[in-house]
Amino acid sequence: VKNIAVAGMSCGGLQTLYNCADPRIKTLMICNSGLFNQSNAGSAVGGMPMPPKEKLNEIHSSILYMLGGESDIAYENGMDDFKRINHVPACATNLPVGHGGTYGQPHGGEYAIVALAWLDWQLKGDKKAAKMFKGDKCKLLERKDWTIEKNELFKKLK
């Protein structure tokens, strides 16, 4: 197996980041999640891995943050992670739906559309799927209420 994605939602996003250094991983998807700052780590779920923000330095693959906008309880943690990542291509997408995302909608709603495009691009090299994220006028911005931020390495992707 050569194309492995690791993804998680909420606490699962913390587990994804805990395992980010695995050399088999080709891409990461962090959904409605982000590492706690040391100042708020005490409010984390007991028994969950709680890596420090320095763990982000171990990421070696592309990474997508899919967040639920400012009303998402994980918004600040996820956006803080995104802003700290400058050594691999990273992007942060937001849809103002809160922490529950669109998972309860038929077929996963908008989140599923974006997640599948990411996976098709990152794991299969699908150029059409890449258009969802790449460029100043990426297809994501044509979808209702979505926003996207990209780090400098992401902006340079061909």
Model-predicted regions and their roles:
Residues 1-10, 14:
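Gly/Ser-rich "nucleophile elbow"/oxyanion-hole loop immediately N-terminal to the catalytic nucleophile
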Residues 4, 92, 119:
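Divalent metal-coordination and catalytic microenvironments
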Residues 12-15, 78-81, 111-115:
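Stable alpha-helical elements in mature extracytoplasmic
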Residues 13-23:
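Short glycine-enriched nucleophile-adjacent loop
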Residues 23, 32, 122-126:
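Sec/Tat-exported extracytoplasmic proteins
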Residues 26-105:
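The feature captures the conserved acid-bearing segment of alpha/beta-hydrolase catalytic domains
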Residues 88, 97-100, 105-158:
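Alpha/beta-hydrolase-fold serine-hydrolase catalytic core, especially in secreted/extracellular enzymes
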